[in-house]
Amino acid sequence: MLFARIIVSLICRSKVLPLGKTQYIWFFSRLIVSLQDVILNSFTMKQILLLTMATIAIVSTQAKNITTPKTNGYPITQVPFTAVKVNAQTFWGQRIKAAREVTIPLAFEKCETTHRYDNFKMAAYTLQHPGHNGLQTPQWDVSKLKCLPFDDTDVYKTIEGASYILQTYPDNRLKQYIDSILDIVAAAQEPDGYLYTSRTINPAHPHQWSGAKRWVEEEALSHELYNLGHMVDAACAHYQATGSNKFLNIARRYADCVIREVGPRPGQVCVTPGHQIAEMALTRLYLLTGDKRYLDEAKFLLDYRGKTSTHTIYSQSHKPVIEQTEAWGHAVRAGYMYAGMADVAALTGDTAYINALNAICNNIVSRKYYITGGVGARHEGEAFGADYELPNLTAYNETCAAIAMVYLFHRMFLMQGDAKYIDCMERTLYNGVISGMSVDGGRFFYPNPLSSDGNTERQPWFGCACCPSNICRFIPSFPGYVYAVKDRTLYVNLFTGNTAHVEIGGKTVVLEQQTDYPWNGDINLRIQKNQAKAFAMAIRIPGWAVNTPVPSDLYRYTDCQTRNYQITVNGKPVDGVKTDKGYLIINRVWKKGDVVSLHLDMPVRTVVANPQVTDDRGRVAVERGPLVYCAEAADNTSHSIFRFLMPTNPQFNVVDRTINGQHQVSFGVKAIEVDGQTVDTDADGRVKVSDTRLTLIPYYAWNHRGADDMEVWLPQSIEALGNYR
């Protein structure tokens, strides 16, 4: 057996199969195991090594026959995060630094201390000891272990995030650590590629959600395909970071197992994912390998949803995906499914998918979208609510759901080139996503309510730790959302200090962006190098700068400022600037040293919700630039924030403020002060109104000083104040 492993290891490590067909490795390894005695008795070691190298050459030729797709199908191409170096001291640079130095190491540590690695080790032990059934070691009865069937994905997601870090901040120790984890993961894989520790640890007594056999509970809670999805995403990222196919081969073997066993053909199990993400991941695997089977499987998983025996709104299986026009059910599942639909539609041209996505996105941003960019109103089912059901104190707004919305909105932009999707993405990024992690990267929210009575606090980890590990993989990928290219047009979507190397028409353009956004609205774009000569620069004018908080009537500003920006090139006004779908288009022959200067006014503005949002009637939210603000008790100790009345025409004052939080966290923000009134009652029950001042901080910054009261929507009348807390 040792001999066989040595030979197969030579093949796997040869790197002739970075994208090759893993079935060749599997077949060859089985052949060696069965014939190793004959081989050892019939050939010298030199002959064996020559035979091995010949096999490598043959398999290498097979691998080269795979054609990687030239495009992901979207008409607009994302500039990869590896081509955009975000400055370390910028708003987003600090968050990437926190993810690199705190969040990802913390997640790896938690995977150790919470026994996530042990799950793989126990599964490997079971595979290595076929007679073991778990009964001799009761702690290995999975039904009694304190684990969830998707705990494996926390390992995968953290590896994915670490792999993104490796691509921008090479770290040999981190690379070696990941390699050691992959040894554990590989050992837990069953001979046919199946990798799901909740069953493999003890097939006789798997986790209660796993079902007696493979796939039978997939449409409920087994998460077998969910595990596949995160594994594939992580494996693709690891391959792109290291060039090693070690993880990629593991993931492909599981994906190939799924393709063999899950589908509409006779002898297969016809199920669709109970928790979506495999659709996006399999599409990504197709783009990396060129193996169309993965794209076909992704489309099957979407096309058959609503056509199997399971019909639940919770998992969006209540009807076929092309018939869905509203966002319903578990918000994370939904967001991942919609993003997967976009990926498949881009590659297949399925207009029915696109029509459904247009309707769903419109439903979200016009009726089910929080001012913070979060989604998922209900704790029950972590789900979207009905139209205009947007409670504040009980809002769920899972961090993972916000990340899913970023995936969806960005894909819709790549498909349609409309800035309204980036406007929504920006709102979600600056409020709904980063509120899910503390500024130092060490504590996390699962739900993100818009009101708190002091019972909500970030935690260092969760039993169900999907949100921290999701942050691990998302934050390092942020630079990939800043720019995009279509033909000879460069889209500037987000504003953060960075240097980008962009390919336009096959020629390199180096662009430097300087800004202190989101604290002020001055953005300078300097051409450092330009081999492309003439091209169009499409600069997004944020919706908040043109009186449009969201692309619907769900929210509106109480004032009316229709133009809050100015733009110059080399200090001079630009003549003949065109606007298209929310972008200013400047088309010219660019020279090294050219500077585009965009100034966005950043007044403090109040927002009101559509009257059909009953929880927000008579109340206003406060915004400045892309940031939503909130009142927190820690800044307002002289009165209850729940009894504050915002005046009809408030006068705001923007001030610098340092938040000295718990756990040695200290950071600066732009705070907002406003004079108003506080309402109370005397001993006889009579209402008393007195003048006071309220301080507001960015929503993402709350809860760094312990659990405390917090409010986003502030009343403007005693009637709206409602019951005192």
Predicted features, each with a name:
Residues 201-222, 248, 253-269:
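Asp-box/WD-like beta-propeller blade repeats and closely related beta-sheet repeat scaffolds
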Residues 1-65:
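Bacterial Sec-dependent N-terminal signal peptides
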Residues 312, 369-387:
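Flexible glycine/proline-rich, aromatic-decorated loop/lid segments
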Residues 170, 186-190, 243, 259-263, ...:
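Helix-capping and short linker residues that terminate individual alpha-solenoid repeat units
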Residues 174-186:
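Aromatic-lined substrate-binding rim segments of carbohydrate-active enzymes
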Residues 64-172, 176, 206-241, 276-293, ...:
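Aromatic (Trp/Tyr) and acidic
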Residues 298, 357, 423-431, 436-526, ...:
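C-terminal beta-rich recognition modules with glycine/proline-rich loops and embedded aromatic residues
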